[in-house]
């Protein structure tokens, strides 16, 4: 899991250090950098090759000039770095990009390996110079010492040679980070519910289409784990007043390929999921994925979309309990104070506390660019910091906007 992020000269950020805890609520106005941070964390987490970043594959991040900091006087480069925990060890990684005919191209890559930092610097002849330097234990200090002033030994390889090292797994140049993916990320708008589904196995997709098939498998193969998932899902439905229970109905036979429907129970009445409120179809994939996973980082933009306040509170409760019981971690981009406050309430009253930390990352836009205020949430549910006045103003403004509806 990525535990720290550094962004320099990228989008609206300049030399910004961001801690990443087990539970992170990303809060702030539009265009303050929340999606930028979530996109960047996902991009780094799913990177396969240190010299190739696909900025426009999963998210449309634009060309070099879209990404370089428009507030900066120096628009020739941008960089980002991270601290990642791998097998209980902290590893550091850093990339620097310049303009290549409008595309963002890696010109320098640094990472820790074997108690040293290796630096790969790309040259105009497509060769890559290899440097080493001592490695600091502190991420911030490591970033400060990542300039050429601290480089030591040097060697030169062709880019093809380095790519060969990557393919054969030279651990001194390309550590395990390139094959270890920890994050699942949902899209801001989940798939619309269907009147019926064709049952076949499907892997995770950001829109949540796969959830119906997983739920059917839970009903087909009842055991302790699947019963727990179904019971917790029904409990959430009752606490949120969204539904009282979930059932699966097969249309022809009981085979794995039979079409089926997802029905929601309201007392003695069953209603097809496609005929209930839109908020149910938006939150159902989130809940099921949270319940089926353990020790997974889950990124969710706008989990509260189309949910009334009671359901937003129930979701805050579920996030807390799922973190505690399943050891999942969260990146939640949200405008819901109901969700955050219910999470803090659960933290305050829980006898069994989760392992790890939680925080609010409050994003603001200033004349000099985007800034982030880190607001740790203590084990007593209270903020362990001075709360900015603008944080309270943000939620008041959100409430005032609702008066226009």
What are these regions (language model features)?
Residues 169-275:
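Extended helical coiled-coil dimerization/tether regions that scaffold
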Residues 63, 103, 162, 170, ...:
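Intrinsically disordered, low-complexity regions
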Residues 1-70, 83-85, 226-232, 242-405:
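Switch/communication elements of ASCE P-loop NTPase nucleotide-binding domains
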Residues 1-194, 224, 341, 347-353, ...:
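P-loop NTPase switch/coupling surface
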């Amino acid at each position: 899991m990525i535990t720290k992020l550094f962004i320099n000269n990228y989008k609206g950020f300049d030399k910004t250090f961001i801690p990443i805890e087990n539970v992170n609520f990303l809060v702030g106005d539009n265009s303050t950098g929340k999606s930028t941070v979530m996109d960047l964390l996902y991009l780094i987490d799913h990177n396969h090759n240190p010299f190739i970043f696909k900025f426009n594959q999963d998210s449309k991040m634009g060309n070099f000039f879209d990404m370089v900091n428009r507030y900066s006087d120096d628009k020739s480069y941008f960089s980002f770095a991270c601290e990642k925990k791998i097998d209980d060890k902290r590893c550091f990684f850093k990339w620097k990009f310049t303009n290549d005919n409008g595309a963002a191209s890696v010109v320098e890559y640094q990472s820790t390996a074997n108690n040293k930092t290796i630096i790969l610097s790309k040259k105009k002849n497509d060769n890559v110079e290899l440097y080493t330097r001592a490695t600091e234990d502190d991420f911030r200090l490591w970033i400060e010492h990542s300039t050429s002033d601290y480089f030591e030994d040097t060697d030169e390889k062709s880019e093809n040679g380095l790519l060969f090292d990557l393919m054969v797994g030279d651990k001194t140049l390309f550590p395990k980070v390139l094959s270890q993916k920890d994050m699942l990320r949902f899209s801001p708008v989940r798939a619309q519910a269907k009147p019926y589904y064709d049952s076949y196995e499907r892997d995770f997709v950001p829109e949540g289409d796969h959830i119906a098939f997983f739920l059917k498998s839970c009903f087909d193969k009842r055991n302790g784990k699947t019963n727990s998932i179904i019971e917790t899902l029904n409990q959430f439905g009752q606490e949120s007043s969204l539904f009282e229970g979930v059932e699966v109905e097969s249309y022809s036979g009981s085979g794995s390929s039979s079409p089926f429907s997802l029905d929601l129970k309201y007392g003695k009445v069953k209603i097809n999921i496609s005929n209930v409120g839109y908020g149910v179809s938006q939150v159902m994939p989130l809940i099921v994925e949270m319940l089926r996973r353990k020790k997974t980082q889950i990124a969710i933009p706008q989990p509260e979309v189309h949910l009334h306040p009671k359901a937003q509170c129930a979701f805050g409760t579920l996030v807390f309990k799922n973190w505690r019981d399943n050891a999942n971690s969260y990146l939640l981009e949200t405008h819901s104070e109901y969700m955050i406050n219910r999470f803090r309430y659960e933290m305050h009253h829980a006898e069994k506390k989760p392992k790890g930390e939680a925080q609010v990352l409050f994003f603001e836009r200033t004349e000099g660019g985007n800034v982030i205020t880190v607001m740790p949430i203590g084990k007593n549910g209270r903020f362990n910091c001075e709360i900015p006045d603008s944080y309270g103003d943000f939620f008041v403004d959100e409430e005032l906007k609702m008066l226009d509806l």
